[in-house]
Amino acid sequence: MNTALAQQIANEGGVEAWMIAQQHKSLLRFLTCGSVDDGKSTLIGRLLHDTRQIYEDQLSSLHNDSKRHGTQGEKLDLALLVDGLQAEREQGITIDVAYRYFSTEKRKFIIADTPGHEQYTRNMATGASTCELAILLIDARKGVLDQTRRHSFISTLLGIKHLVVAINKMDLVDYSEETFTHIREDYLTFAGQLPGNLDIRFVPLSALEGDNVASQSESMSWYSGPTLLEVLETVEIQRVVDAQPMRFPVQYVNRPNLDFRGYAGTLASGRVEVGQRVKALPSGVESNVARIVTFDGDREEAFAGEAITLVLTDEIDISRGDLLLAADEALPAVPSASVDVVWMAEQPLSPGQSYDIKIAGKKTRARVDGIRYPVDINNLTQREVENLPLNGIGLVDLTFDEPLVLDRYQQNPVTGGLIFIDRLSNVTVGAGMVHEPKNEAAVASSEFSAFELELNALVRRHFPHWGARDLLGDK
């Protein structure tokens, strides 16, 4: 058993008291990102090791694995704690997103270790979508690289406001203050172009040696700031969704018998209480909340992030994909939107293509009307292109098959975040963040020949069950 964990349980007065104490700790979700070989997995391993979160059998196994797969000579290869895939261990890299949990006396943490290689950028975006803070690793020998810029931009695009720039491998540059200062100024010059009001902090450290990770470094007396762990324990996280209006996407209509009809889902933002007047969209029908049902019994109110089932006083037509919100709020359904896209497929995203999209519990189709611009990661400039390639990031105009109720992603990630699904393979090919809902549908481009338009009209007339879209943009 983990001796540190056993000591904590003893101090709390038993397992039950310890578990209650854990429930009342705040939770911080963060990810490590940066270029390949910057030491992301090693840093997480060091955090787990120095906070004594490794079980004795894991430590013994780590000693054996370090001899077989390690890249640190006679030292423990802490990266092996999170690099679990055989291909990762053989190549000494991270491919998949690895999640780890640990806690200290002050806070609980969920870590997402994301890959640094450019071809795995889509994995990094997936890991960042649920996080509140990003640790950006920079190799002190190499400075700010393209992947550092790419991951910084994706993190801010996904709504992360807290960035900790961890300048790693300081032991390989003789713990030079000049090197740290130069990289800090270089990154701040780049960060001035990033969107949003960001909280950026810098920590010089050595994940391999443990300098400034969980304890102060004796080799960097010139640095008087907090350690990385102190930053993680004290950073103030304010969830945007808590202050936003109520949004409840219906995931499932629960009808176990004739006497019960509830609408199950996770409250995306705001709060809801018994007796509150709510409105179902897109129908616009109103009712009152009669009960809030949870696994632990009925509640009088619920808050953002909680999984609940709402029972209404009236029997109204609500199905999966509908949205419940406060009755006095106006949120019109829109036929189109401009969307920030991270493209994840080998086949480029091009104007005129149609995809299934899923947003909250709603699934429909969307047509790509145009690509306004992709973003050049090196300098965050915009340029004109014909398509968006694999790992490309850009602003895209979409028109939906049916009007959708949307929020801007920065206001509500649940009702403003969507995924693109290939209609043939059913594979997720892209992630989208609503930049701006639009009340007017874009006019489809006239790039189709007369034969294609006639064939399209013929198919829609005689085979309506195929669901073919009108190439001219009409339904």
UniProtKB/Swiss-Prot annotation:
<protein>
    <recommendedName>
        <fullName>Sulfate adenylyltransferase subunit 1</fullName>
        <ecNumber>2.7.7.4</ecNumber>
    </recommendedName>
</protein>
<keyword id="KW-0808">Transferase</keyword>
<keyword id="KW-0547">Nucleotide-binding</keyword>
<dbReference type="InterPro" id="IPR009000">
    <property type="entry name" value="Transl_B-barrel_sf"/>
</dbReference>
<keyword id="KW-0067">ATP-binding</keyword>
<comment type="function">
    <text>With CysD forms the ATP sulfurylase (ATPS) that catalyzes the adenylation of sulfate producing adenosine 5'-phosphosulfate (APS) and diphosphate, the first enzymatic step in sulfur assimilation pathway. APS synthesis involves the formation of a high-energy phosphoric-sulfuric acid anhydride bond driven by GTP hydrolysis by CysN coupled to ATP hydrolysis by CysD.</text>
</comment>
<feature type="region of interest" description="G2">
    <location>
        <begin position="92"/>
        <end position="96"/>
    </location>
</feature>
<feature type="region of interest" description="G4">
    <location>
        <begin position="168"/>
        <end position="171"/>
    </location>
</feature>
<comment type="subunit">
    <text>Heterodimer composed of CysD, the smaller subunit, and CysN.</text>
</comment>
<feature type="domain" description="tr-type G">
    <location>
        <begin position="25"/>
        <end position="239"/>
    </location>
</feature>
<dbReference type="GO" id="GO:0070814">
    <property type="term" value="P:hydrogen sulfide biosynthetic process"/>
</dbReference>
<dbReference type="InterPro" id="IPR005225">
    <property type="entry name" value="Small_GTP-bd"/>
</dbReference>
<dbReference type="InterPro" id="IPR031157">
    <property type="entry name" value="G_TR_CS"/>
</dbReference>
<dbReference type="InterPro" id="IPR044139">
    <property type="entry name" value="CysN_NoDQ_III"/>
</dbReference>
<dbReference type="GO" id="GO:0000103">
    <property type="term" value="P:sulfate assimilation"/>
</dbReference>
<comment type="similarity">
    <text>Belongs to the TRAFAC class translation factor GTPase superfamily. Classic translation factor GTPase family. CysN/NodQ subfamily.</text>
</comment>
<dbReference type="InterPro" id="IPR011779">
    <property type="entry name" value="SO4_adenylTrfase_lsu"/>
</dbReference>
<keyword id="KW-0548">Nucleotidyltransferase</keyword>
<feature type="binding site">
    <location>
        <begin position="34"/>
        <end position="41"/>
    </location>
    <ligand>
        <name>GTP</name>
    </ligand>
</feature>
<feature type="region of interest" description="G1">
    <location>
        <begin position="34"/>
        <end position="41"/>
    </location>
</feature>
<dbReference type="InterPro" id="IPR000795">
    <property type="entry name" value="T_Tr_GTP-bd_dom"/>
</dbReference>
<feature type="region of interest" description="G5">
    <location>
        <begin position="206"/>
        <end position="208"/>
    </location>
</feature>
<dbReference type="InterPro" id="IPR009001">
    <property type="entry name" value="Transl_elong_EF1A/Init_IF2_C"/>
</dbReference>
<dbReference type="GO" id="GO:0005525">
    <property type="term" value="F:GTP binding"/>
</dbReference>
<feature type="binding site">
    <location>
        <begin position="168"/>
        <end position="171"/>
    </location>
    <ligand>
        <name>GTP</name>
    </ligand>
</feature>
<dbReference type="InterPro" id="IPR044138">
    <property type="entry name" value="CysN_II"/>
</dbReference>
<dbReference type="InterPro" id="IPR027417">
    <property type="entry name" value="P-loop_NTPase"/>
</dbReference>
<feature type="region of interest" description="G3">
    <location>
        <begin position="113"/>
        <end position="116"/>
    </location>
</feature>
<dbReference type="GO" id="GO:0004781">
    <property type="term" value="F:sulfate adenylyltransferase (ATP) activity"/>
</dbReference>
<keyword id="KW-0342">GTP-binding</keyword>
<feature type="binding site">
    <location>
        <begin position="113"/>
        <end position="117"/>
    </location>
    <ligand>
        <name>GTP</name>
    </ligand>
</feature>
<dbReference type="Pfam" id="PF22594">
    <property type="entry name" value="GTP-eEF1A_C"/>
</dbReference>
<dbReference type="InterPro" id="IPR054696">
    <property type="entry name" value="GTP-eEF1A_C"/>
</dbReference>
<dbReference type="GO" id="GO:0003924">
    <property type="term" value="F:GTPase activity"/>
</dbReference>
<comment type="pathway">
    <text>Sulfur metabolism; hydrogen sulfide biosynthesis; sulfite from sulfate: step 1/3.</text>
</comment>
<dbReference type="InterPro" id="IPR041757">
    <property type="entry name" value="CysN_GTP-bd"/>
</dbReference>
<dbReference type="GO" id="GO:0005524">
    <property type="term" value="F:ATP binding"/>
</dbReference>
<dbReference type="InterPro" id="IPR050100">
    <property type="entry name" value="TRAFAC_GTPase_members"/>
</dbReference>
<dbReference type="Pfam" id="PF00009">
    <property type="entry name" value="GTP_EFTU"/>
</dbReference>
